[in-house]
Amino acid sequence: PTWSTSFSTSCVIPALVRAKELGWAVDEKVLARAVRYVEQCKLPGGAVMYDIRPIPRRPGESIDNVKGSLGRMQVANWALRRARSPGVTDDVIRAALEDFFEHHQFLDVARMRPIPHEAYYANAAYFYMFAHCYAAQVINELPESERAAWHKRLRAHLAKVQWD
């Protein structure tokens, strides 16, 4: 392929890592390239770019802002942690989760919007459950003693969107 997104690549990395752990044939170059790509998508301040472009998107209210990458931050950190990337420490995971909860209203606004990326910071409805799924995964990468408190915060956001 000639184009990929940070979040689709991040979804594949843990599967490749697990396949390798199970003894399945995994092309090391493919895995290393995927990890490198996601690492390159990470920006100072914790945001994760949607994709890598020769000409970056304009800064500000961009999809590549922390507020526009709340879900991508979680899946990227989870994937890179599973791949044992040294840059994803517990503190990096905690900071991204804090951003997730601090700016959650931008996911809330986008949740029921019918047109992708029409909400603030180009958030899309399809990122809502995606973001929560991978927040749960990355919480499980933290020390066990911390997980219950993080999951409790996450559950509150999922419970509020459940129907009777």
Model-derived segments and spans:
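TPR/TPR-like (Sel1-like) alpha-helical repeat modules
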Residues: 20, 158-159
